[in-house]
Amino acid sequence: MASSVRLVKKPVLVAPVDPTPSTVLSLSSLDSQLFLRFPIEYLLVYASPHGVDRAVTAARVKAALARSLVPYYPLAGRVKTRPDSTGLDVVCQAQGAGLLEAVSDYTASDFQRAPRSVTEWRKLLLVEVFKVVPPLVVQLTWLSDGCVALGVGFSHCVIDGIGSSEFLNLFAELATGRARLSEFQPKPVWDRHLLNSAGRTNLGTHPEFGRVPDLSGFVTRFTQERLSPTSITFDKTWLKELKNIAMSTSQPGEFPYTSFEVLSGHIWRSWARSLNLPAKQVLKLLFSINIRNRVKPSLPAGYYGNAFVLGCAQTSVKDLTEKGLGYCADLVRGAKERVGDEYAREVVESVSWPRRASPDSVGVLIISQWSRLGLDRVDFGLGRPVQVGPICCDRYCLFLPVRDRTESVKVMVAVPTSAVDRYEYFIRSPYS
C-alpha cells in the first residue's frame, strides 16, 4: 500500500528578506534551450536527532530560505517566454519561492530501496499546489519515524546541477547559523550573456542532435510500457573490477579508465542488452559535461546558470553488446575528450533561436551525475542526508552519492518492466 503525504500548513511564498532588484533578467541560450524545460527535483532524507523541535526547525528553514534568496533573488522571480519567442527571461519582483510542510507515514528506510513506481514519491514535492510554479519550491516532510524528507525543485532553465548544489549548501549553512551570508563563497554570479549566441554559421557535427531511425518501436515502448525503477549500489571493489574488465577488453596502450567511464559503459551496455533491440539499431549515451573551465576564458566562480553540454557516445546494438566493456568505456572517453571551447560554442549556436536543436529520444539513454555535486554535504542542522535521490525515478539514469562511502555510487534508472529482470542480471554479471 502506498504511503500517504498530507500538508499540515497552507503553502506559502517566501520572499527575499531584504530588498532585491526589480528587473527582468535574460536567460542564456543554453538556459533557454528546449531540452531544459523541466525541473531538477531532489529528495534529501535526514535521520533527525531525537527530540527535534519541528516548529523551531521549520521556522529556521523558512528564515534561511528568505535570507538565501537575497543573493539568489532570480529564484524568487518568475520565468516567462520573451515576446519575440527567441528565449526565456526571469521577471524579478520578489514574488517568492514556494515552501510547504507536510507529514507522512513513510520512514527513512523506505528510501533505501527503489520506489515501487516512477511517481511513488511525487507527493514529497507538491509543486502543483501553486497556480504558477516558482523557480524554486521546497517541501519539508516529517516522516513517521521522526526523520525528515526535504524535497527541492528548481527550474532547470534558471540553474544547473552545480549551481543548485551551491545554493543548497548556502541555504543549509544559513539554517544552522554556521555561516554569515557575507562570508559565503562563491558569490552567485548571473552573467548569462557569456553563453549566448555569437551568430556563428560554420558549425561542426554534433551527434547528440542527430536523428537515427527507430528500427524497434523504441519510442512506443518507452512511452506506453510501464517503467520499473531500479536501484543498485556499486562499491569501490565493484568499480575496480569493472576497470579491470574494461582494460582486459580494450585496445593496447589505453590509459586506465575512470570510474565514470567504466560505470557509464557498463550501465549502457547492460541496458541495451536487456531491451533485446535489433542489432542494427543505433544507440546513444548522452551525459552532461561541465564547461565552466572548458570554455575560454573560463566562466567566473559562482556562475549558477546552465554551464554544461551533452557528451554523446554512439554505436550500434551489435557493437555495443559484442565488443566488451573496454569498447564502451572508450566511446564514453572519446565523447568527453571532444568537448572543448570550440565544441561548447557550437552547441550554444545549435540550441539558439532559430536553430533550436534538441536531442531526439530514439535509442537514447541519458546519464546525470549527481554523485559529484556535493548534495551529500547539505546539512540543515540535522546531520548529513542519509539518502540522496530524485523525487521521481524515470528513464533518466542518475549516479547518486552514498553516505560515508565516497568511492561508492548508487545508480537509479527506470526500465521497461519486461526488461527489468534482464537488466538487473546483466548489471550483476559483468563477465557475461
Curated annotation (Swiss-Prot):
Induction data: Induced by ethylene in ripe fruits.
GO BP term, pick one: fruit ripening, climacteric
Tissue expression pattern: Expressed in fruit.
UniProt cross-references to Gene3D superfamilies, sorted A to Z: Chloramphenicol acetyltransferase-like domain
EC number: 2.3.1.268
Top EC class, one word: transferase
UniProt GO molecular function: acyltransferase activity
The UniProt record lists the keyword Endoplasmic reticulum: no
UniProt-annotated catalytic positions: 156, 379
Superkingdom, taxonomy of origin: Eukaryota
Keywords: Acyltransferase, Transferase
Catalytic activity: 2-(methylsulfanyl)acetyl-CoA + butan-1-ol = butyl 2-(methylsulfanyl)acetate + CoA; ethanol + acetyl-CoA = ethyl acetate + CoA; butan-1-ol + acetyl-CoA = butyl acetate + CoA; butan-1-ol + propanoyl-CoA = butyl propanoate + CoA
InterPro entries hit by this protein: CAT-like_dom_sf, Plant_acyltransferase
Disulfide bonds: none
Function: Involved in the biosynthesis of volatile esters which confer kiwifruit flavor. Alcohol acyl transferase that can use a wide range of alcohols as substrate to produce esters. Exhibits acetyl-CoA:alcohol O-acyltransferase activity.
Family: Belongs to the plant acyltransferase family.
Annotated protein name in UniProt: Alcohol acyltransferase 9
Organism from which the protein derives: Actinidia deliciosa
